[in-house]
C-alpha cells in the first residue's frame, strides 16, 4: 500500500486525509498463511538448507500454518501439524492431502506413536516455553538423519530480569546466550549445530529471533559464530 506515493507498512502511519491511496498487487508475494512463512523461508535461504523436497516433515506449534506453507511449497512429501490449540490451521492447508492435523496436543508431551511417521525435517515455532523443555520430545520423534530447525525466541529463554519493556530482549549478549543455551541443550542430546541464522523478520513485539539447524551427530556449537550471527541480526 502506498499513501501519497510513499510505502505505508504500519497501521499507525500518520497520513494526510487528502493523500492518494494505492494498493498494489505484488505478483511475487507468495501469500503465506502467516507472517511466520517469511521467517522460515528466509532462514532456509540464509542457511542454505536443509533440503525439503520429498521429505516427511513435522511442524511443531503449527498455529495458522506459515511454516507448513513454506514446507509444502518447497516440495515436502507430507507435513504433520501439531498444536496445543484447535482449529487454527489455515483452511487451504488443512484441506491439503499432504497435511495431517493433530490439534489439542502439547508438543512437550508428544510421543513418537502420536505421529503417522518419523519426521525427516522438524520445524518448531513455540511460545511461552523454553525450547530446552521441548527438545527431548522433538528428537525422540525424529527419523534417522533428520534435520531440526527450531526458532529460538530469546524472551522465552532468558530470565525475567533480561526482558525489557514490551517483552523485548534488547541486549545482544542476552540474545546470543539464549541461542547458545539451546544449541548446548541440543548437543547434550546428541544433536550438533550445522548452522544458525537470524530470522529476516522480528517477532510481533520486535524481538529478534533466530533459527538453529540441528542434526544428530553434527559438530559442537561454535559460541563465537553464534555471537557473530546474533550481532549481525541486532545490527539489522
List PLM regions with ranges.
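S4-like RNA-binding module at protein N-termini
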Residues: 1-50
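Conserved S-adenosyl-L-methionine
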Residues: 55, 70-78
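S-adenosyl-L-methionine
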Residues: 78-133
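Short, glycine-/aromatic-enriched active-site segment of Class I SAM-dependent methyltransferases
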Residues: 154-171
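Flexible, glycine-/basic-rich loop-and-beta segments that form/coincide
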Residues: 208, 213-236
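A short glycine-rich, Lys/Arg-flanked "PGG" loop and its adjoining helix->strand segment in the class I
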Residues: 132-149
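Conserved class I S-adenosyl-L-methionine
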Residues: 52-63
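Glycine-rich SAM-binding Motif I of class I
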Residues: 65-66, 87
Amino acid at each position: 500500500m502506498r499513501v501519497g506515493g510513499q510505502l505505508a507498512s504500519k497501521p499507525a502511519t500518520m497520513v494526510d486525509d487528502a493523500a492518494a491511496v494505492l494498493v498494489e498487487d505484488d505478483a511475487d508475494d507468495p501469500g503465506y498463511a502467516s507472517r511466520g512463512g517469511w521467517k522460515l523461508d528466509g532462514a532456509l535461504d540464509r542457511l542454505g538448507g536443509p533440503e525439503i523436497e520429498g521429505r516427511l516433515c513435522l511442524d511443531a506449534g503449527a498455529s495458522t500454518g506459515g511454516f507448513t506453507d513454506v514446507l509444502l511449497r518447497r516440495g515436502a512429501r507430507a507435513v504433520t501439524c501439531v498444536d496445543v490449540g484447535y482449529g487454527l490451521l489455515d483452511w487451504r492447508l488443512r484441506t491439503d492431502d499432504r497435511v495431517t492435523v493433530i490439534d489439542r496436543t502439547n508438543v512437550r508431551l508428544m510421543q513418537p506413536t502420536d505421529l503417522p511417521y518419523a519426521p525427516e525435517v522438524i520445524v518448531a515455532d513455540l511460545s511461552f516455553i523454553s525450547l530446552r523443555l521441548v527438545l527431548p520430545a522433538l528428537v525422540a520423534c525424529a527419523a534417522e538423519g533428520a534435520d531440526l530447525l527450531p526458532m529460538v525466541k530469546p524472551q522465552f529463554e532468558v530470565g525475567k530480569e533480561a526482558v525489557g519493556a514490551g517483552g523485548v530482549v534488547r541486549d545482544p549478549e542476552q540474545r546470543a546466550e539464549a541461542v547458545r543455551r539451546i544449541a548446548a541443550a541440543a548437543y547434550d542430546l546428541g544433536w550438533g549445530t550445522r548452522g544458525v541464522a537470524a530470522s529476516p523478520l522480528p517477532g510481533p513485539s520486535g524481538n529478534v529471533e533466530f533459527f538453529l539447524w540441528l542434526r544428530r551427530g553434527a559438530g559442537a556449537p561454535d559460541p563465537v559464530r553464534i555471537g557473530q550471527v546474533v550481532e549481525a541480526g541486532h545490527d539489522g
